[in-house]
Amino acid sequence: MAAERGARRLLSTPSFWLYCLLLLGRRAPGAAAARSGSAPQSPGASIRTFTPFYFLVEPVDTLSVRGSSVILNCSAYSEPSPKIEWKKDGTFLNLVSDDRRQLLPDGSLFISNVVHSKHNKPDEGYYQCVATVESLGTIISRTAKLIVAGLPRFTSQPEPSSVYAGNNAILNCEVNADLVPFVRWEQNRQPLLLDDRVIKLPSGMLVISNATEGDGGLYRCVVESGGPPKYSDEVELKVLPDPEVISDLVFLKQPSPLVRVIGQDVVLPCVASGLPTPTIKWMKNEEALDTESSERLVLLAGGSLEISDVTEDDAGTYFCIADNGNETIEAQAELTVQAQPEFLKQPTNIYAHESMDIVFECEVTGKPTPTVKWVKNGDMVIPSDYFKIVKEHNLQVLGLVKSDEGFYQCIAENDVGNAQAGAQLIILEHAPATTGPLPSAPRDVVASLVSTRFIKLTWRTPASDPHGDNLTYSVFYTKEGIARERVENTSHPGEMQVTIQNLMPATVYIFRVMAQNKHGSGESSAPLRVETQPEVQLPGPAPNLRAYAASPTSITVTWETPVSGNGEIQNYKLYYMEKGTDKEQDVDVSSHSYTINGLKKYTEYSFRVVAYNKHGPGVSTPDVAVRTLSDVPSAAPQNLSLEVRNSKSIMIHWQPPAPATQNGQITGYKIRYRKASRKSDVTETLVSGTQLSQLIEGLDRGTEYNFRVAALTINGTGPATDWLSAETFESDLDETRVPEVPSSLHVRPLVTSIVVSWTPPENQNIVVRGYAIGYGIGSPHAQTIKVDYKQRYYTIENLDPSSHYVITLKAFNNVGEGIPLYESAVTRPHTDTSEVDLFVINAPYTPVPDPTPMMPPVGVQASILSHDTIRITWADNSLPKHQKITDSRYYTVRWKTNIPANTKYKNANATTLSYLVTGLKPNTLYEFSVMVTKGRRSSTWSMTAHGTTFELVPTSPPKDVTVVSKEGKPKTIIVNWQPPSEANGKITGYIIYYSTDVNAEIHDWVIEPVVGNRLTHQIQELTLDTPYYFKIQARNSKGMGPMSEAVQFRTPKADSSDKMPNDQASGSGGKGSRLPDLGSDYKPPMSGSNSPHGSPTSPLDSNMLLVIIVSVGVITIVVVVIIAVFCTRRTTSHQKKKRAACKSVNGSHKYKGNSKDVKPPDLWIHHERLELKPIDKSPDPNPIMTDTPIPRNSQDITPVDNSMDSNIHQRRNSYRGHESEDSMSTLAGRRGMRPKMMMPFDSQPPQPVISAHPIHSLDNPHHHFHSSSLASPARSHLYHPGSPWPIGTSMSLSDRANSTESVRNTPSTDTMPASSSQTCCTDHQDPEGATSSSYLASSQEEDSGQSLPTAHVRPSHPLKSFAVPAIPPPGPPTYDPALPSTPLLSQQALNHHIHSVKTASIGTLGRSRPPMPVVVPSAPEVQETTRMLEDSESSYEPDELTKEMAHLEGLMKDLNAITTA
């Protein structure tokens, strides 16, 4: 409080604020905030002080028992008093409705009647106290673990034992780790009193040193954990008199690795037994420990070492050395000391303004190294661009905003515990402006230098202060689209430039600059948008990477500086990985070499190096592999066994040490053997490293020998196996025949076991290598057990009570098994009191090892059952033919998938010849293999079997759904997506749903199917300036997956210049009139509502509008005059020809022939590019044919089916067989198909011969028929039987005079509206309504029976001239690969062979038009050509020009009306 009062007095001093103003620009961004106590505010502003808010008491880890009560303490201090809540496992507890949990007045949590069972553990877990002050913030306490002791379970029972007087003895009692504190011992059913000679180790084990007669008796272990006591087996400890002979020195209990926390006590157990009685000494890291003079080190009974108040210096390797004068043995263990997290520097309270950068400091220590996380007002702080963890543990907040205010806590956690420390952040308001003048906005703010990670800004002084020597400046900047703004101040007054550092490459930033004077901050400059450059300056690979082994556990790696460093190399990152694993580790290095320690011995590692400069990581070097040096083996050979061959030899068998413990190439084995009697000489024999057995000969008859084996590498000898004994025969016995029957067999049944005893065969001259015991209910062949030849009794365990068992006993040797001896017994009922069979206590048992190696399972098969289940079956050749398992063998099944790569195997054990593998992934290939294990021996893995699970419907929607507008086409959008992350099979298709109402039923959405190999789709003809919602659903062979979340997209606004060409190109016809096509350069006036991006635009000036109207009128008058002059110059001869042709009734093909010189005017289409050409009569008898392809669009060519309605339904919501580069569709086409027409033309504009015809009125509907079925649209050329050139026709119809049947058999088209112009020859029309379109065909085409494709013409702009066809878009024609071009005859060829006619439907203004077929007939014979040439003499009606001019006048009036509107 004194510091606060001093801060207030300081803040009220004007000189202080002048000094702060001068230093404002000198502050670094991260240090621009005031630390606890001083608030950097201007005079007059209210000062907020920091509020004390902290925990007085925090909960700690607690151990409880079932049924008891427990209190977790918690108390917090604040003014006003905080509200206390509790979290369990991260979730708030509802204490209002909880009967067993209640909140105490001080904030502690009281839990009554703790519940804990095997399947219900509601009280055990992690608890956290949360304190909240409504107007201040929230803090959370450390996390405390509540452990509830489980039900007492003995993992190890005490066993009967005997001890010589004066020696040491132990009795095991292993229970659950959490129940060890509740263990006690009883002797003869009375509590055992512990003293310096009789102690209980922390594990619960009882140690009796210097045993006396009084120590003998019955012992049992008792666990009392709140419920009824749990008793272990009661066993007898016998104290035998001192035999005064020498016995082996052995460890009864060896130390094991331990982990303790600083401040705890630890006991390193070590108990040895032998005669003479051994003494125990301890060493730490090869230094002897003085347990007599040290107060913290105590030698307990039996030799165990107790260390009190453990410190970090106590960590290390401890050696227990037992010595009895004749022999010395030692054991070692590692003690690891851990430390709870502790704060070296705690975060402090901070004052700051908005847009400033601050740093909360937090420095912790602990072992293992703690992890640090930050919490703001009780919520986790997730690192981002503006919340960063710097210098390992500090929290940096960039660009403060008001919502950042509150309490921040640094929480440190490791395996031992956790701790928290917090601080408060207060965001201060800027001081109000004084009455003095403030500076205006700085001028000409520009980015003078733009780099990848920094931008330099410069500006001019404000206009209000041209000199600006006393002005300071603040630059505010933020990422585009981010509301959080940061500030950078100039370093001294008058400086007009600043460099913004630590920016992201290729990122857009928004900058603004404000000037400050002594009165306050002025106006802000206009925002400046600048994009940083992309990152390209990264280091190259480090050359000359080398690695060499420095020791068995370390490797040194060296390298050089990259040639292309692109700047100063800041550091290197060295990556290394053990061969055969997928876990790569890394270490930061500042030099050009590094030695990695703690590696595995004789193991291969790979290394690579990546250089870092200020831009980031560079290119990695190639991997370099090296192996650590070899060392002596760290483990003994495995599976040592002895086989007595005769009276003078014994065969030894063994297996190499485990691969991980060989530590190098095994170069040999050292065999040591001696007689079992004490003080006998040891003999050594060396064998090669590939040899796994050795025959030891020259032994004494009837003598017991001890054997042990050790492995060797070039570095030395590893540890040896334990001594194993075998006795040679008294004499060389016969092994040419099987042993005889054992002389006797006795059985003694118990409740769940049978004790079997026997005597050897009477004939002692035949070798007996062991006995085989068979037993089973009703049959002795169910189970078989083999025992050593010296064994005379055996206890068969795990039998059923009250069951009849048949038992057989056979002696065997290497020749085979002898004659069996049978016996039967009935186990006792379960109600009988179990008794200990004293006959078998301490009975030696030496099982005979199976001499044959284990064979792997065969015939492994994988049967697919479902999408996540596969059954694995196999056979075992080591079993009998009926494949019945009669021993304790088991099988291990392993499986994995190769997707993703380097996945690890999963394993499961089975006791049958099959296993059901569940929980697999759908549509995934797995490989399986099986291994058999019997005792300590295992086979190799079997051959692998493979199986792929069935598919399943996708369980996740398509991801990354994005919608963008297509450039240049505002009505077209492009939908992109990525496949589902859980496709569960091959994706066969997608369905896109879109609608303008996100809440509409899904069946009301428009759907767009897409094939499965596409990840993008175009949708056309959407409404402008309209929000659409899109969802995507994936499907595979099993069905549809879930839909993605709705993605909203608003189509852009477009002006009329954009709309006109788009509508025209897509053929979208609307009802009502349209604006005429005034050319691509014409742009009508736009209102503010039609401006792009929705921004209002200023309306056109009225004078400009008047000028446009007058100009259009003048141009129109000029065009009309030109057309009138052109038309009046037609010759009289041409008019006569028209009249004659109109009155002629010789031909049945009635159409308007195009005169050679007549060129009907076209007001909106450039007829210089494409005109109606007449047909010239050429006398050339050998015309030259040209093959001209017709450009087509697959969207506009639709095969004609039986009816037009069926065509429309086929196109609706279905896949298209042939799609263009981008899949396209229209919304209008989904609501109702708009008629489409396509008018293909020759790629050479002057070539096509086109005739335009009127559409019949509604009163006289005409029908177009096809005489045969349609051909496939994929056919490129159809050949006339009698013609040498390919022809491309839409259909073949005979002359109407020759065939009228074709007219009656064709399907009808849609009714045509009345044409705006009528033909002059109406009196010659077919009364039955035959079509007026021109058809040309030959009789040979009818006979051929070929069916040809029909193309539909898409209507062009409704105000285009009826006399001139639509001009295809400029540029080279595009061809659909599915619909190849059909050749047309050239103009010259047509003059001699055929009068080829294309028909186009011409409708009136504003009316919708159905599709009409475009007919390109084939070439007729010569005689047909002659007749057609005669028909071509047709000419116009005398009044035809008048009608055309009248029609043209109507169009002019429409244009004038639109222009003036």
UniProtKB/Swiss-Prot annotation:
Subcellular location: Cell membrane
Topology of the protein relative to the lipid bilayer: Single-pass type I membrane protein
Stretch list, region Disordered: 1041-1097, 1138-1160, 1174-1206, 1235-1276, 1289-1381
UniProt note on tissues of expression: Widely expressed and also in cancer cell lines.
Fibronectin type-III domain: residues covered: 441-535, 541-631, 636-731, 741-831, 856-952, 957-1054
Record field: compositional bias (Polar residues): 1087-1097, 1191-1206, 1289-1322, 1330-1349
One cellular component (GO) term of this entry: intracellular vesicle
SMART domains: FN3, IG, IGc2
Residues in compartment: Extracellular: 34-1105
GO terms, molecular function: BMP receptor binding; cadherin binding; co-receptor binding; signaling receptor activity
InterPro entries in alphabetical order: FN3_dom (IPR003961), FN3_sf (IPR036116), Ig-like_dom (IPR007110), Ig-like_dom_sf (IPR036179), Ig-like_fold (IPR013783), Ig_I-set (IPR013098), Ig_sub (IPR003599), Ig_sub2 (IPR003598)
Residues on Cytoplasmic side: 1127-1461
Keyword Electron transport belongs to the record: no
Disulfide bonds, paired cysteine numbers: 74-129, 173-221, 270-320, 362-410
Modified residues (Phosphoserine): 1178, 1194, 1401, 1432, 1434-1435
Glycosylation site residues: 73, 210, 326, 470, 489, 639, 715, 909
Main location: membrane
Chain ranges of the Ig-like C2-type domain: 52-141, 152-238, 243-336, 341-426
Positions with biased composition (Basic and acidic residues): 1052-1061
Signal peptide: 1-33
Keywords, comma-separated and alphabetical: Cell adhesion, Cell membrane, Disulfide bond, Glycoprotein, Immunoglobulin domain, Membrane, Phosphoprotein, Repeat, Signal, Transmembrane, Transmembrane helix
Top-level lineage group: Eukaryota
Known partners and oligomeric status: Interacts with MYO10. Interacts with RGMA and RGMB. Interacts with BMP2, BMP4, BMP6, and BMP7.
Family affiliation: Belongs to the immunoglobulin superfamily. DCC family.
Annotated protein name in UniProt: Neogenin
Originating gene: NEO1
